Amino acid sequence: DVEYEQRYQAALSLFNKRQYRAAIEQFEALVAANPNHSLADNAQYWIGECYYLLGDYRAAILAFEKVFTFKNSNKNEDAQYKLGLCYYNLKDRERARQEFQTFIDNYKNSKLIRKAEEYLARL
């Protein structure tokens, strides 16, 4: 519905202004209000991005993992890549290796494939 989309755009605007904590609150409210809305998976993804940019990689991991609970999400690819980056930044080499390998196996045509392969080569 229109109101949900307006609230989503407002939350995205906060993200773009680097007001990540405020954006997290707004995105979480959207997911809670209607987890079946077509933008709910995107809202969940942006929660992960906010935490990632705040340097809270553990919270980002939890948020990105929730993206996969949404059916047919268009954010699965990006969430999988970001999981690799989160573990990489946490210096968890084994888990980062797993996540990047999963990304490479599942998203062979991704524009991020080369970057994922570069990270994997560093591990």
Give residue ranges: language-model regions.
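Short solvent-exposed coil/turn linkers within tandem alpha-helical repeat scaffolds
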Residues: 33-39, 69-75, 104-114
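Acidic, proline-/serine-/threonine-rich low-complexity intrinsically disordered segments
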Residues: 1-10, 14
